[in-house]
């Protein structure tokens, strides 16, 4: 069932929702980012990953500086409508460190 942007609960977390970014082919988790309404609208309009930077308080497109863009193939919404998954085709590493994904450190 397709959801509308108006159904996403941005207010639960102060105007943003978490976005899990996964490789469309392997389903490997690449990163966790955040989206507000505007970045989600840009993602749907352009087909590229756009997010809200909590530390810089601004919109950013994945790959705008590095060239490592993510073509969004599908957006999934969780049952509470307050979290998203972007299934993407990455053009390069997801992590700013150059690692394929942002989860390359182990805690246990």
Curated annotation (Swiss-Prot):
Species classification: Archaea, Nitrososphaerota, Candidatus Cenarchaeales, Candidatus Cenarchaeaceae, Candidatus Cenarchaeum
Protein name: Phosphoribosyl-AMP cyclohydrolase
Signal peptide annotation: none
Record-stated family: Belongs to the PRA-CH family.
UniProt cross-references to InterPro entries, sorted A to Z: PRA-CH (IPR026660), PRib_AMP_CycHydrolase_dom (IPR002496), PRib_AMP_CycHydrolase_sf (IPR038019)
Protein's GO biological process: L-histidine biosynthetic process
Cofactor(s), names only, from the UniProt record: Mg(2+); Zn(2+)
Gene source species: Cenarchaeum symbiosum (strain A)
EC number: 3.5.4.19
Binding site for Mg(2+): 78, 80, 82
Pathway(s) of this molecule: Amino-acid biosynthesis; L-histidine biosynthesis; L-histidine from 5-phospho-alpha-D-ribose 1-diphosphate: step 3/9
GO molecular function per UniProt: magnesium ion binding; phosphoribosyl-AMP cyclohydrolase activity; zinc ion binding
Any single Gene Ontology cellular-component annotation: cytoplasm
Binding site for Zn(2+): 79, 95, 102
Location of this chain's protein in the cell: Cytoplasm
Subunit structure, interactors included: Homodimer.
Keywords: Amino-acid biosynthesis, Cytoplasm, Histidine biosynthesis, Hydrolase, Magnesium, Metal-binding, Zinc
Cofactor note: Binds 1 Mg(2+) ion per subunit. Binds 1 zinc ion per subunit.
Pfam name, any one: PRA-CH
Role this protein plays: Catalyzes the hydrolysis of the adenine ring of phosphoribosyl-AMP.
Catalytic activity: 1-(5-phospho-beta-D-ribosyl)-5'-AMP + H2O = 1-(5-phospho-beta-D-ribosyl)-5-[(5-phospho-beta-D-ribosylamino)methylideneamino]imidazole-4-carboxamide
Database matches in Gene3D superfamilies: Phosphoribosyl-AMP cyclohydrolase
């Amino acid at each position: 069932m397709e959801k509308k942007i108006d159904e996403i609960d941005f207010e639960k977390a102060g105007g943003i929702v978490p976005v899990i970014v996964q490789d469309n082919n392997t389903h490997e988790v690449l990163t966790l980012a955040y989206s507000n309404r505007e970045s989600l609208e840009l993602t749907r309009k352009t087909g590229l990953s756009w997010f809200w930077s909590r530390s810089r308080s601004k919109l950013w497109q994945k790959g705008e500086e590095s060239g490592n863009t993510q073509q969004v193939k599908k957006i999934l919404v969780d049952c509470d409508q307050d979290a998203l998954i972007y299934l993407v085709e990455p053009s390069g590493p997801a992590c700013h460190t150059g690692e394929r994904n942002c989860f390359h450190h182990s805690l246990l």
